[in-house]
Amino acid sequence: MDFLRIEGGKTLNGSVPISGAKNAALPLIASTILSKQSVQIDNLPDVQDIKTLLRLLQNLGASYQYEDGLATIDASKLTSTVATYDIVRTMRASILVLGPILAKYGRCEVSLPGGCAIGQRPIDLHLQALEQMGAKITIKAGYVVAEAPNGLKGSTIIFDKITVTGTENIVMAAALAKGTTTIINAAKEPEVVQLCEVLKDAGVQIDGIGSDELIIEGTDREPIEMRAIHVIPDRIEAGTYLCAGAITNSTLSIENVIPHHLDSVLVKLKQMGFPLDVNESNITIHPARTIEPVEIVTSEYPGFPTDMQAQFMALALLANGASIIEERLFENRFMHVSELKRFGANIQLKGNIATVIGPTELWGADVMATDLRASSALVLAGLAAKGTTNVHRIYHLDRGYEKLEEKLNALGANIQRLSE
């Protein structure tokens, strides 16, 4: 198993290109099931989750070619509607095939999903919504079995709480349903917006894109004509590299970004004292004279993203005073706290609120990644620490960050990927 060895204390310099967004790419790949012909998707990040979903589609009878961030996928005629445990267990996003397969073929079986161990992330909201659209759903031997032999019917779906993958699943299901589906309390994330825009470009009538109420006119099981897709840049990767610049007190630029997707992150960096230059597709961060403590509450987009919480906790270790971080979306997303303490961090936990007491002198340590974003926080702490840090179980990192150590080394970091 691989681990990363980081020699800390290096100043970073230069610019880093931001990859396509994994969380946008996954629903876009799933949406090719709705297409009547092959679909090209470019700017795909070279990360494990993308390869896993492509392999899942191949298992279902799709064909694809994938090289240098460009995939050509033909999922127009699947030969199976069963997404098996051996692939689904490694990735939660596998559930995204449920909506499109059920809508198109009238039946789908998906093994209950795996992925990061950060809280329950129940798929009940997906299943209840599909039942409202006429599906019969049972759980058998660890599989969700969904049946709608006469197709799905448009309905009014009110999500009890905002769900990104739930919104995406129902948008795809509604695209091929009969009649009008209204989704109330829909997620507004840029990744959801891109999926809706791609489907609209393919002829599906969708109103309210970018709002919390989506109205979708279904095609009554008529496959759609999808065009080439360019995946939006990864706002979480972008935020992580901005934190890498901040935590090493460096001047660093990120390229190929959509700055307004990062508004909530940029506000917090400015509050902490980091000067920012923002233009159309680039952001440059400069060193802070003093790093100020910050208060962060995670929430759905356009609020502060839960996927940036761990990275800001690492950064807050260097702030002059106490920072307060409240996690409102997941109940088990502070697993990185015990690992950050191995660097010397002073963090007090009470329920879903972490108080980070700074400034802390960080020392290199052996640490273990617990989930995707927590692992990037450990890398950030390692960059700032004195001495050598070894980050173990980095398969979490490889699920979501493309060439992380290569990109950081190009900026002046000293990181090696080694085998245990």
Curated annotation (Swiss-Prot):
EC number: 2.5.1.7
Keyword annotations from UniProtKB, A to Z: Cell cycle, Cell division, Cell shape, Cell wall biogenesis/degradation, Cytoplasm, Peptidoglycan synthesis, Pyruvate, Transferase
Residue positions of the active site: 116
GO MF term (any one): UDP-N-acetylglucosamine 1-carboxyvinyltransferase activity
Matching SUPFAM superfamilies: EPT/RTPC-like
Gene Ontology biological process: cell division; cell wall organization; peptidoglycan biosynthetic process; regulation of cell shape; UDP-N-acetylgalactosamine biosynthetic process
Binding-site residues, phosphoenolpyruvate: 22-23
Catalytic reactions of this protein: phosphoenolpyruvate + UDP-N-acetyl-alpha-D-glucosamine = UDP-N-acetyl-3-O-(1-carboxyvinyl)-alpha-D-glucosamine + phosphate
Record flagged with keyword Cell division: yes
Entry GO CC: cytoplasm
Binding site for UDP-N-acetyl-alpha-D-glucosamine: 92, 121-125, 307, 329
UniProt entry tagged with the keyword Transferase: yes
Positions carrying 2-(S-cysteinyl)pyruvic acid O-phosphothioketal: 116
Family matches, as InterPro entries: Enolpyruvate_Tfrase_dom, Enolpyruvate_Tfrase_sf, MurA_subfamily, RNA3'P_cycl/enolpyr_Trfase_a/b, UDP_GlcNAc_COvinyl_MurA
CDD domains: UdpNAET (cd01555)
Membrane spanning residue stretches: none
One Pfam family recorded for the sequence: EPSP_synthase
Similarity section: Belongs to the EPSP synthase family. MurA subfamily.
Functional summary from the UniProt entry: Cell wall formation. Adds enolpyruvyl to UDP-N-acetylglucosamine.
Protein name per the record: UDP-N-acetylglucosamine 1-carboxyvinyltransferase
Lineage summary: Bacteria, Pseudomonadati, Campylobacterota, Epsilonproteobacteria, Nautiliales
Gene: murA
